[in-house]
């Protein structure tokens, strides 16, 4: 677990913003965070025990939404290269499965937000 570092965020603090380079995967250990659209509207909450930034592991790119701490929050954070290496060391098949799930999620989001 030496590739992980603990980061703390105060309620209202942005963890990442729309358009930022996607370079890390976050595991939310305490608190909750919310996804915020480019217009500033919160549209989803991620609770304690969940993760965010999974797309960074596989494809990098830029953040499609901002993430803001809804409450004080503590995350375990790992860089996307380290996370990918860790994932591959467990099973290369997991990478293929995750890529498929991310594609499905992207398609569902495109349909949802095109209406």
Q: What positions do the PLM features span?
A:
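Cytosolic regulatory regions built on CNB/CRP/Popeye-like sensor folds
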Residues: 1-115
């Amino acid at each position: 677990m030496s590739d992980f570092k603990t980061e703390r965020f105060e309620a209202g603090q942005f963890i990442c913003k729309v358009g930022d380079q996607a370079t890390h995967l976050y595991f939310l250990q305490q608190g909750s965070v919310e996804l915020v659209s480019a217009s500033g509207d919160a549209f989803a909450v991620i609770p304690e025990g969940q993760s965010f930034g999974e797309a960074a592991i596989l494809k990098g790119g830029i953040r499609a939404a901002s993430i803001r701490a809804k409450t004080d929050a503590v995350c375990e954070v790992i860089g996307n290269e380290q996370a990918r290496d860790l994932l591959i060391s467990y099973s290369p098949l997991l990478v293929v499965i995750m890529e498929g799930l991310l594609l499905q999620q992207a398609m569902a989001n495109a349909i949802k937000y095109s209406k």
